[in-house]
C-alpha cells in the first residue's frame, strides 16, 4: 500500500458523513496532543480534512450524548439516534431518528454522502440521497450474515440499495467481510476491500520466546466489552486456567455495553486479583501491553458482525501470537499454527485448552511468534481508506475512472493500488 495523503485536493464539496464513534472527542484529543485511542483514528480524520480543504463537512455521530458544534469548516452533530429495545418502540425511534437525520441532510445540502454503517441509517438516508441524485459511498467494517431465510429476507432492502446503479462502489474492511457481502447478494463487481495504511511491520521487532519471569503469564484483550465479542467466554477460560494452570493474568482494554456484567462475572469466578479492566486507553499503551503479553485473545462470537479487527494486526506487528475464535471473518485468512491458534467461538473450555497449549509448549510458542510476520502479510489489502475516498470523489466529479475497482471481488486480489499517476 502507498501513502495516499499527498495527492492534490479535489474541487470543493459538501460532505455528509454518518457514523458511529465520537468525532468531537477525537478532535479534542488530537488538538490536545493526546495519543489516539485506536489504530488509524487520526489518519481517518486527516483523510476527511484533506477532502474538505476547500469544502464543508457535516459529521453525524449516531450514539453519543447530544451536541452540535462547529470546528473550522466542519459541523459536528452527536445524538442518541440508535434505538434501544424492540417492538413498536424500536420502530418509532427509527422513524423519528430517520426524520432527524434527513432534516439535518436537507439543511446541510450535501454534494456527497458517506454512510459507515449498513443498518437502517443507510436505507433511510441513502434512499433520500439517491432521490436527490447525491453520490453515496457505503463504507463498512461489517460482516453480512446469510444463514437463515429470515436474515436473507431482512437483508433484501439493503442489498437492493447497494446494487442500485447510482452506487458504483461499496467498500468493506478486508476480504472476508467483502466476500460476505457478495454472498448476501451485492454485485461482486462493485465490492472493494480497503484497509488502513501499515504504520509498522512485524519484522521491525524480534520474534518472542516463552521466557518466564517467575510471575503469571499475561493475556491481553482489546476491544468492545460485550458478550457478543466473547469477553465472557474469555473470563470463563481464565477461570479454568486459574484452577488447573498455567497461572495467567488478563488485561482488558476498552469499554462497552456489558462492562458492568463482565466485571460482576469476573468477581463471581474469583478473578478479582487476576483480571484488570483498564477502560479506554491510549493506543500506544495498548500496543505496549500487547508486546509485554504472551498472548492476545480475540474471542469474537459468530453473531458479532465484524471484519478483521485492528487488534489482530497490532498483535501480529508486535510479534505476539493471537488466539482467535473461528469467526467467519477470521477463518478464510488465518492458518492455525501460523501466528495464531483457533478455537470454537463460545467454547470457553476449548479456548482454555488453546491457551494452555501455547503457554506450556515453548517450541510451539516460538514457532507461532515467528509466524506472525507471514500471518500479517496474508491480511494486507491493496486499497487504503484514503485512496478509496480520493478515488470516489474524483470519479463523482468526472476527473477519472474508479481505479480502485480493479480490485473488486469480481477480479481477484492484486497486491497494491498504484500511486496516482503511476502505471497500473
Predicted regions and their residues:
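Nucleotide-activated donor-binding/catalytic signature segment of Leloir-type glycosyltransferases, i.e.
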Residues: 263-281
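A charged, aromatic-enriched C-terminal amphipathic alpha-helix characteristic of glycosyltransferases
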Residues: 54, 363-416
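Short hydrophobic beta-strand element within catalytic cores of glycosyltransferases
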Residues: 317, 321-324
